Amino acid sequence: MLSLQTIAKMAVATNTYSKCHYPILKVFGLWWKNNTLNGPIKICNHCNNIMVGEYPMCYNHGMSLDIALIRAVKERNISLVQLFTEWGGNIDYGALCANTPSMQRLCKSLGAKPPKGRMYMDALIHLSDTLNDNDLIRGYEIFDDNSVLDCVNLIRLKIMLTLKARIPLMEQLDQIALKQLLQRYWYAMAVQHNLTTAIHYFNNHIPNIKPFGLRCALYFNDPFKIHDACRTVNMDPNEMMNIACQQDLNFQSIYYCYLLGADINQAMLMSLKYGHLSNMWFCIDLGADAFKEAGVLAEKKNRRVLQHILGLNIFKRELIPPCKDPDPYQIQILLKNYILKNVSTVFTYYCQ
């Protein structure tokens, strides 16, 4: 049951006040000051979001109670930790990022179950497995700059996160800091499952994440996100094509890069190198004709049948009508249920 003081503070925080009331709000404990915030604390009647400063009372502003609580714990702001817990924030999330004995004791006194051992990893996995915008954001806030992860096996953690994200998060295991790895992990999970609220949040809170966002869009075959990312990220079309070819059946990503001027012969060879034959056949449909080089590569990979097929002079090229501009709507309509035409040509040849 909420105390009378808690109810009174919540009632005050649901209203907007002029600057002449600010000294009273500070005394009342409804003020948040740190490196980035300095203003009165408000709580939205509709969504329970916490707002700081001169924001209107409406949806999609501020931060959730849990996020506010997590940040207060990281700042070791005892009064705000108590306030946000009383208002309904989950103190168990705060306990996961309490890095000092005093904050750990405070969280425990407020009802948190002290996390131990694998509970940190279990929480990280759980928050990403729910495939929910709010949980991904909570996971990012809890584990960003969280020293409790210093004690885990870093190589094992990096491998696990990469496998779950289904996209290469780094070129080599020792080339990326844990902080950056986790940021990429949360972002990749959001893009992979089209969690738009989380994507927008990460774009605003993770520095220099947009180039990785373009990589995710290419890898997960999303022409709309590719189109949006290309407005702010300058990447060579051939580099984009290399990323697109790393995942099979990425026809829409490959076609987008092709329209930007990427080398379709190199895309054909890269697709074969990665073992993604559907991508290779799609490149041939687009007009790729690097059959001699592909035959040599197929021989090196001990694909004798494919080597023989690539030596046949039966293929038709430029079977897909080109678009003037890389329009994601046209690309999706054109390729959503695309059937590889030169694969059909091969079947027809051998069935005659």
UniProtKB/Swiss-Prot annotation:
InterPro entries: ASFV_MGF360 (IPR002595)
Protein's GO biological process: taxis
Domain of life from the UniProt record: Viruses
Up-regulation conditions: Expressed in the early phase of the viral replicative cycle.
Pfam families named in the record: ASFV_360
The entry's keywords: Early protein
Family per similarity comment: Belongs to the asfivirus MGF 360 family.
UniProt function note: Plays a role in virus cell tropism, and may be required for efficient virus replication in macrophages.
Descriptive protein name: Protein MGF 360-16R
Organism: African swine fever virus (isolate Warthog/Namibia/Wart80/1980)
